[in-house]
């Protein structure tokens, strides 16, 4: 994140003696940072030596297996009934991706009984359904429906669900996930025209310190593999930390939509950026207010980007063939837009109650076999219907 945060006990000066009470020895300092020593970092103070690992075991590979895309066409996927079960990490199913980003879903029914560390990617978990607690060495974050959980490289975390199940749309990338640069000044502060403010970002506000000894499983993802590390101490043994690298939460319900005289393009709704992709939030808002405005989007061609939309809630549900939890993929180079009759039907509308997450990628996406199993046939043909009373979704 672009702002500094500290939590817990810290020595007055970094890299100096920080002693435990009652002659208990030194706390162990760890510098955790990105891009060598040139990126954002945090300093953490542990009860135990961070490198202590009893045993290591390779569990398997994690690289997605992509299938032949077939003829280029618009596609839709019905995900409401994806299999549920397992913990959030185990339940994840990757549907599409490229070298810059993977997109998937998770529908867990239980909390994690191990710890997870993705050392090769940032992760962003959009909470569509459910609530719970994300615990990490940086502290505790409570999450609920609508929250984006942004988890940076190297975070050792565990997710505890509050209810019997949850549903997430998951973005994973080997680059940073951060607010768009155009929203920030040269010092990293969010500017007045940004659609959210630092006050909207929730950071860990309390530590959950453990000094337990025993056997604790940490599953480490790196080099497209998962390894099981058994520690002889609880990994959340941090008594204090400070810096710029830590997990955080932003709620889609805190996004401040921009409206205009005429239809606003999708970049207006951008929420985060990564390398070669953007993430946008479509939220309830007023429509355009020119007397001759057409609220439905104009037809457009993604000449250099693939567009993926995850439909969470709202008025898109009346659109032909699109339901809650569906995903659409509009690939490179093909025009898309309102279905027949939708443009005319939008005239006179004053607001929308839609809620959706969009990811635009600047390199083509590949599909997995899981995606093909969920595909809804005939989506490409929905533009062939006769004009009439149609429906529309204002994201495109």
Which residues are covered by each model-predicted region?
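Jelly-roll (double-stranded beta-helix
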Residues: 1-396
